Amino acid sequence: KRLLAEMDTPVMLMPIDDFGTQDIETLYHHTYHRQGNEEILSSILPDLNAVAVFAINKDLKLVIDDHFNDIRLQPLMQSVWTHLYRRSYAGPRRKLYAYFHDKRMEVFSFQQNRFRFSNSYEVTNEHDALYFLLYIWKLTGMDTEKDELYLVGGLPYQEWLLKKAKEHLKFCRVLD
């Protein structure tokens, strides 16, 4: 039996070059508050020259290990990152992606085969989402006339957010 499980837990990204030299459990513990009943796992993202470090509940891991022979565990965002990374090569403009799911917004961009920016935000309304996106846009030095913003995933306030973002950014699109 085979299993691919995508874990919706906080993810710490680190350069692949630093992966073998760091104590990932200690780094993860300092980055995120842990419950104590977690096993720290990692998933290598070779195209992005990064490693995703994440946690799984030890009891859940035990059940999975007991019932499946071929197990692959990865962060929920890994397939999204991979898909949008490949898409980021289309066109000359830099791209900022915002992926919406479960009242969360995952914002990331790529540059030179690496993550340029990646962070996760809890967004309970459209105003929070717009504020975070415009702040990140400014923080990362993106150009309002040249670069692109892509909104992806389940946006409950898609029309409003797209309209307001276009008031500030020339290129803003929704990806299905």
Would you name each region that the model predicts?
Residues 1-85:
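Active-site neighborhood for divalent-cation/phosphate handling
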